[in-house]
């Protein structure tokens, strides 16, 4: 486990070598939230638990949902994904995001359909803000919008990107994070705005 960030009442850890990238958000009030799950390993689960008690495992999309049942059982955590994404995830989802699911008042979900039907981001709203974009955006250097042949709807991705430009945050993480190469902040929101403005003009 590599600690990437420590700010007011929160820390972000990275699970080295995970693809898609897996992160652990530790919030002083909400507890531990695992973002994506790698192939299950009991030793890794024990390491994660030593960092923080995990209350939730959040899947931004189907791409990061690996060995869902095993992680859920080992961590005694509740699994979370959008209602639209649940049918594509192999394993039990306890909380289907449909506008009513809340982990804590300082955290919210941003639906960013497009890469998959139910792609969703997790935002920690307390300043400085932190957003886990999953596959909605991708690290080039800073996160950007990149089209894929198998996008559920690139048009939806563009609409989501426009909405992202109005958000306030300092740190951003995506599924294709590469430790030591990907930039995540501070200054992520402004860098993403610049990238998106350029891409949407192209």
Give the positions of each predicted feature.
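Active-site metal-binding motif and surrounding structural segment of the metallo-beta-lactamase
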Residues: 39-85
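Long, non-catalytic terminal segments
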Residues: 1-7
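Short glycine-/acidic-enriched loop or helix-start segments at secondary-structure transitions
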Residues: 44-46, 67-69, 90-91, 142-143, ...
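Pre-active-site segment of Zn-dependent metallo-hydrolases
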Residues: 14-56
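Short, hydrophobic/aromatic-rich segments at coil-to-beta transitions
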Residues: 7-14, 104-110
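Histidine-centered catalytic micro-motifs
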Residues: 57-64, 114-117, 176
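Metallo-beta-lactamase
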Residues: 10, 32-34, 40, 69-202
């Amino acid at each position: 486990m590599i600690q990437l960030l420590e700010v007011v009442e929160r820390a972000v850890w990275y699970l080295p070598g995970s693809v898609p990238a897996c992160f652990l958000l530790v919030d002083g009030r909400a507890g531990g939230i695992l973002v994506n799950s790698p192939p299950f390993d009991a030793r890794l689960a024990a390491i994660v638990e030593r960092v923080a008690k995990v209350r939730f495992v959040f899947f931004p999309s189907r791409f990061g949902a690996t060995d869902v049942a095993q992680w859920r059982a080992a961590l005694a955590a509740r699994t979370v994904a959008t209602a639209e994404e649940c049918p594509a995830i192999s394993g039990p989802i306890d909380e289907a995001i449909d506008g009513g699911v809340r982990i804590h008042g300082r955290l919210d979900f941003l639906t960013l359909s497009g890469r998959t039907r139910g792609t969703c981001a997790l935002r920690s709203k307390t300043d400085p803000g932190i957003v886990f974009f999953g596959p909605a955006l991708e690290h080039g250097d800073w996160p950007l919008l990149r089209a894929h042949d198998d996008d559920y709807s690139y048009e939806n991705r563009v609409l989501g990107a426009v909405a992202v430009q109005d958000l306030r945050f300092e740190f951003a993480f995506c599924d294709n994070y590469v430790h030591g190469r990907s930039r995540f902040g501070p200054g992520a929101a402004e860098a993403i705005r610049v990238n998106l403005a350029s891409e949407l003009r192209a």
